[in-house]
């Protein structure tokens, strides 16, 4: 069963809001970043990757965000346009803020890390006055991610977008996307993540991310079922808890749970798995698929992306996912 109801006859299937940055992925693998000499540039940021993935799968997608007034900002906007993402609501920063950079290190498939440069970044300067109610009400769904909640005025802009979505029956997806380097403390993070989750229809995160959100609670011991049920007293209809190589579990308000597996692949790097999973999972739900079917799409998409060098460039089409699922071994 798919418990989500999407409004018909809206020009957008999905609008994402939040982080737009640049990934610089190491070309030399099996070595530390200190010894890496060359990198390849890609568009990055969790909501950007998810929007790109959704557009590749055929969804009509838009974006609300802010980019720097320089070559990097123009690179990001141009790439989104090339991928058929509406950029009418991407603002240009006029304060001298820069594009966030993420340098990746690929020592081995099991040992990957990211070095982030997030000081004075343009995406966190998105102002509430730059969030259009008319734009949001034209969409079936809104995607928010946790990084955009890290600082004002982006934080308030996201909460305003949430209010507009709730007002106009736009289904809200919350991808937790916890990045500790943009926050002052775990307590601060937990406060704002919980406030956002309370207004979301679908919450997607890792077990570790949900643990962080529960820091302020007096749980002697938490588990996936307890975590999911907490949100069903608010707006949540689906809570997805990811367990890396052990797959994921989706819980629904009616008490059901669905376990999703993974597809065997040759892993190059681990980052990008969550974004590619979310994009295909959201696509499946918007297309009306049952939750287990949407989870299978998500698992297949994640396996494809972790076998490739990039995140955004590697986001697969529907045909590529179907072909992969026909031949790859599924581990449940």
UniProtKB/Swiss-Prot annotation:
Catalytic activities: 5-dehydro-2-deoxy-D-gluconate + ATP = 6-phospho-5-dehydro-2-deoxy-D-gluconate + ADP + H(+)
Pathway: Polyol metabolism; myo-inositol degradation into acetyl-CoA; acetyl-CoA from myo-inositol: step 5/7
Pfam families found in the cross-reference section: PfkB (PF00294)
InterPro entries assigned: Carboh/pur_kinase_PfkB_CS (IPR002173), DKG_kinase_firmi (IPR022841), Myo_inos_IolC (IPR030830), Myo_inos_IolC-like_sf (IPR023314), PfkB_Carbo_kinase (IPR050306), PfkB_dom (IPR011611), Ribokinase-like (IPR029056)
Molecular function in Gene Ontology: 5-dehydro-2-deoxygluconokinase activity; ATP binding
HAMAP family referenced in this protein's UniProt entry, alphabetically: IolC
Biological role stated in the UniProt entry: Catalyzes the phosphorylation of 5-dehydro-2-deoxy-D-gluconate (2-deoxy-5-keto-D-gluconate or DKG) to 6-phospho-5-dehydro-2-deoxy-D-gluconate (DKGP).
Name of this protein: 5-dehydro-2-deoxygluconokinase 1
Organism name: Bacillus cereus (strain ZK / E33L)
Gene giving rise to this polypeptide: iolC1
